[in-house]
Amino acid sequence: MSQQVVIFDTTLRDGEQALQASLSVKEKLQIALALERMGVDVMEVGFPVSSPGDFESVQTIARTIKNSRVCALARCVEKDIDVAAESLKVAEAFRIHTFIATSPMHIATKLRSTLDEVIERAVYMIKRARHYTDDVEFSCEDAGRTPIADLARVVEAAINAGAKTINIPDTVGYTMPFEFSNIITGLYERVPNIDQAIISVHTHDDLGLAVGNAIAAVHAGARQVEGAMNGIGERAGNCSLEEVIMAIKVRKDIMNVQTRINHNEIWRTSQTVSQICNMPIPANKAIVGTGAFAHSSGIHQDGVLKNRENYEIMTPESIGLNQVQLNLTSRSGRAAVKHRMEEMGYKETDYNMDHLYDAFLKLADKKGQVFDYDLEAIAFINKQQEEPEHFRMDYFSVQSGSSDIATASVKLACGDEIKAEAANGNGPVDAIYQAINRVTGYDVELVKYDLSAKGHGKDALGQVDIVVTYNGRRFHGVGLATDIVESSAKAMVHVLNNIWRAAEVEKELQRKAQNKENNKETV
């Protein structure tokens, strides 16, 4: 049996389903590139048949990613399979992941079918997918509640049909680790052709057992683990990939398996996902939480000072967290800033040096000293906002005092036109949002406002993340500045640009669809 565990990331498919606002194509690509740097073997990046936007995202990522295999999800439906293949065909190599429910409950109440019909349908769809690629994965949805004899029948038929990877999902997070281990062992005992496929697992955290179930399955012989960075996903989330990866590395003495992951990229990838998805990482989160390597007890602190291994089973450096932070000033040149970015693991292609250095100088003039966390924050924000902007803040002013009423004046560039407005609001942030909305004419509703500090002390940068609804859809915006009102204004301008870009994308997709129809009529 292979000692290599395939890491299958579903942050951009199962993980994204849990987000309050959908990600843009650019944001998804940014996460995909981070996952590629980290070395995931397979990344599932969308469900192409679900929407034209998802199709475009999958296609864009498939065209860009070279070192990880790109995968798309499809139900056991002909159209799903065909659309998935169409979105992926620009990739050098790709995988189609198809699935159908196998538990008695799902078959009877959801599918209104029989096990024999489910097997027949699965076999047909796997063969259809094989017309497009040799790399087909099949999932037995709700496998955790499927009798082992039924599960073995489905798995054997799927392998005979050509599936190279068989995924065993604990879809509702119901199974206990010892049960999940027995399921994997049972399949190895009952399925005669099981050596012709890789057995995969996909676990959910409804009972807090997703990682435990994944580790138990690997110990029992599974050789692919599916999950998401930071454990994001439906309901209570997916299996946290960073936890499984580090468990395999730290406990190699009993696991006897390995992954191809670049462990030095774990921290950075986790932060990228957290920031783009607007999902803060709990301080006590294993591996990547801010408290994961903190020691507050006097006894523990004394022990760590004498020997870190007394209370640390891994080091911050083992996940790419460099705790030595160099401060820069406004006198630091471009070379010094570039060198520091390289030391933190960034390549020149990860950021625009001109934009980064300009933002660095402005921040250094305000703060005096700029630290690593400042550089990372402005690099992230610049990456988020480097797309063409229709709206740009030219000027703003807010007047407020001890009363609830504040007055804001704003001047915005709207395309080639400069517009100005003023408005009152319940506090400075509300006032500036009212003024911005008057300028743009967008009737947006603020549904979430988060403020977080990037750095320490009174000079910390303030990052504002907002979620708004517009025409029934949710959009995310982010702003960063030393002033909270300025951060808030930047976040609103960013979200309005995202709304504008989404509308432009929809227009382009409609234009392409119309051209396609016109070409059909001509033929």
UniProtKB/Swiss-Prot annotation:
Cofactor: Mn(2+)
Main enzyme class: transferase
Keywords on record: Amino-acid biosynthesis, Branched-chain amino acid biosynthesis, Cytoplasm, Leucine biosynthesis, Manganese, Metal-binding, Transferase
Subcellular localization(s) per the UniProt record: Cytoplasm
Coiled coil location: none
InterPro entries registered for this protein in UniProt: 2-IPM_HCS-like, 2-isopropylmalate_synth_dimer, AIPM/Hcit_synth_CS, Aldolase_TIM, LeuA/HCS_post-cat, LeuA_allosteric_dom_sf, LeuA_bact_synth, PYR_CT
Organism domain of life: Bacteria
EC number annotated for this UniProt entry: 2.3.3.13
Pfam families: HCS_D2, HMGL-like, LeuA_dimer
GO terms classed as biological process: L-leucine biosynthetic process
UniProt-annotated binding residues for Mn(2+): 14, 202, 204, 238
Pathway assigned to this chain's UniProt record: Amino-acid biosynthesis; L-leucine biosynthesis; L-leucine from 3-methyl-2-oxobutanoate: step 1/4
GO molecular function: 2-isopropylmalate synthase activity; acetyl-CoA C-acetyltransferase activity; manganese ion binding
Catalytic activity as recorded in UniProt: 3-methyl-2-oxobutanoate + acetyl-CoA + H2O = (2S)-2-isopropylmalate + CoA + H(+)
Region Regulatory domain, residue ranges: 392-523
Domain (Pyruvate carboxyltransferase) ranges: 5-267
GO CC aspect terms: cytosol
Family to which the UniProt record says this protein belongs: Belongs to the alpha-IPM synthase/homocitrate synthase family. LeuA type 1 subfamily.
Binding partners and assembly: Homodimer.
Function: Catalyzes the condensation of the acetyl group of acetyl-CoA with 3-methyl-2-oxobutanoate (2-ketoisovalerate) to form 3-carboxy-3-hydroxy-4-methylpentanoate (2-isopropylmalate).
Protein name: 2-isopropylmalate synthase
Protein source organism: Enterobacter sp. (strain 638)
Gene: leuA
